[in-house]
Amino acid sequence: NTDAIDNSAGVNTSDMEVNLKIALSIPLRDGRLTMDGRNALLAEMTDDVAALVLRNNYLQPLALSLAERRGMEAFGFQQRLIQTLEKRGHLDRAVEFLPDDAQLAERRRRAEPFTRPELAVLLAYAKLTLDEDLLESAVPDDPYLARELGRYFPKAIAERFPDALEHHRLRREIIATQLGNSMINRGGPSLIVRIADQTGAAPAAIAAAFAAVRDSFGMTALNTAIDGLDNRIPGKLQLELYAAVQDLLLDRIIWFLRNVDLSKGLADVVAHYRDGIAAVEAALDGALFEDSLSARAARKAKLVEAGVPAELAGRLSNLPSLTAAPDIVLVADRTGKPIGEVAATYFAAGAFFRLDRITSAASNIPIADYFDRLALDRARDSIGDAERRLAAVMVGNGAAGAAAVAAWVKPRHDEVERVRLAVHEIANSGLTLSKLAVAASLLGDLVKN
């Protein structure tokens, strides 16, 4: 770590003290709180303030460890982040001892990723830049995001004087900083550049999608449960669990940006998808095919054996299947069919074409450069779109699950069989980027026809 990471507690504590005193000036001014009462309350909140500050000191090194773990996979996006910061006049590589483009090209050739101190610099600049972008947007004004104030301040003040938070004169700044820090801590330094390059979305839209994914999937509680495994399971395994949540986060942010209207506020979107995702999770036992059920049981057993509590292990073992949950909710919305029927049909279609094997293998495809990464993400998105559209037309026939797939296949057997065999061959022959693109094209053509 850099000194800025290891010694951030002092700055955080000072900021918290100032913001607490500003908040308490409201009840102090209207007579609900005396000066002695204010001082007593500040003293009472000392431990809570310390815990909140230490929490930030926990999350920043964790963000760096996750970025380190990604290694060369994220190299292109990290280089793009540097270039973007330079163009905006926010970063001087020489001042921050960051490599120039020629040095980065040599590092790429040698497969040498960014060092931890370099990632720490990028983390700081990513947060500062995102904070600026969010303050210039309407994101901090979304009523749903007022809950970020409750995450920032100690519970005592949030419970006793909620209006002091709502009318805090730095309300927008605190929301923007709290949300932006959460985004970079959980998504990595190159989060904004990565998602923007894949979708063309502005930072404000990415922030809204981040909040929607985080809260729809209950990721805060999930990450907190993983935090509780400190010194109970091997550190490497714990980092793998955080990375699994991060993978889901990054993937579904893109999905929400492409498939959900976030312009009318987050409250209804989060409520709808949170309930829908919970319904999909509840339906998994009856919707997944035997191979998927066996793989899920094996994942859970392995985690429990390593020391992960059974309930948490079960939730984590569901994540690969829950990646599809927003697609299933969307198909249910468009067809009017129950979540359970749509889930069964969606997974049956995936099993018929072996799409689960393809999407799983896609994460292991070697990526040579930044453009390979974009091509991979585009192909995966195309396959996801095809699977969603297949499920919609299949479930529309009145059946569900394997029966719905069979009913849809029957009148178009020859064409479907040709595509199915080709996709199976791709799934069984060692997946490459070009093969993934071919599979995406075949499935896309099938849906169009």
Question: What are these model-derived regions, one by one?
Answer:
Residues 1-449:
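Ligand/cofactor-recognition surfaces for anionic moieties
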